């Protein structure tokens, strides 16, 4: 899936993200050869990560960039067709980069670049773009606190210091997450 490919580019390979940026127009307009190449590359990246970390103790967790946000958004929309999984991952990746910048893990240019790339190919970047969305930030946060990545009551976020450089971050304040969610609702 092309949206999952973009997520892999965000989290694991800056070179792949740059390739996706360069080929965005052709990919979105159906260039079959490039789509096959994008999916092939993303599968190779994912397979390499899973092979090296079968039990998700290291780099494999980084494949979940955006997924903590995504799973909560899917739940709050009752897993309906108003939010496809790939769209949720896209919005979640953008939220993760926003949190990363606010924590000072990356410069503000990084989430701006990711958001601009997604927008250039008409992929959702914010909660406000979910048609018919009815929810609030507290409910989204509560659902995030139930995610499988919660350990001993602490949400483990996959955040980024740059495109292609992700890390696990714990103890991110609820207030910061609520603020980022609210901004995404209002954008």
Where would I find each of the regions flagged by the language model?
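Single conserved hydrophobic/aromatic residue that forms the stacking wall/gate
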Residues: 1-12
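Internal alpha/beta core interface subdomains
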Residues: 13-17
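Short, flexible active-site loop motifs that bind/organize anionic cofactors or intermediates
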Residues: 1, 101, 167
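A structure-centric signal for secondary-structure junctions around beta-strands
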Residues: 8, 59, 152-154
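C-terminal charged capping/lid subdomain of soluble metabolic enzymes
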Residues: 105-187
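Acidic/polar active-site rim loop that often engages polyanionic ligands
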Residues: 6, 19-23
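Active-site segments that bind and position negatively charged phosphate/pyrophosphate groups
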Residues: 22-138
